[in-house]
Amino acid sequence: MKWKFYSLAFVAGMSILTACSSDDNNDNDGNGGNGNGNEIENGTILKGTITSDVTLAAGNTYKLSGEYIVEEGATLHIEEGVKIIAVYDDIADYILVKQGGKINAVGTPDKPIVMTSEKEEPGAWGGIHICGRAHTNAEGGKGSSEIGGAVYGGNN
């Protein structure tokens, strides 16, 4: 029952705002500037792999193009009021947090974090995939995510 409530709350929160367009085409190689956890500029295109801490600053809008992978040891910080818009193209747009990677998303009721797509229809972006080390019922105790092929599961 809790799962259904949290799923419904997440979907409701995601659908509050609609996507908007930006003419800013800054590219992000994944490490957010110098790779020391600095804030990424407003309007930056998120893509690639991050290997150290990165912060998406409060109130900024970012575009997601393709995969954005958080590797082991890195943390993706998403502050309140951030909007992430998946680019409308033929590439699967998603955020993948691999085992040992972290995501710290802190929205508020007044300033929610919004993740949406330029194409306003269900299934237009791949979502967030968090691959932990919890027990699973997969054969051998581990599985592989459908998007990104990352390993999940274990005995933790």
Placement of each model-derived feature along the sequence:
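Bacterial N-terminal signal peptides that target proteins for export
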Residues: 1-7
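Sec-dependent N-terminal signal peptides of Gram-positive bacterial secreted proteins and lipoproteins
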Residues: 11-14
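C-terminal motif of bacterial Sec signal peptides marking the signal peptidase cleavage site
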Residues: 16-19
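Beta-strand/loop edge motif enriched in small/polar residues
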Residues: 21-156
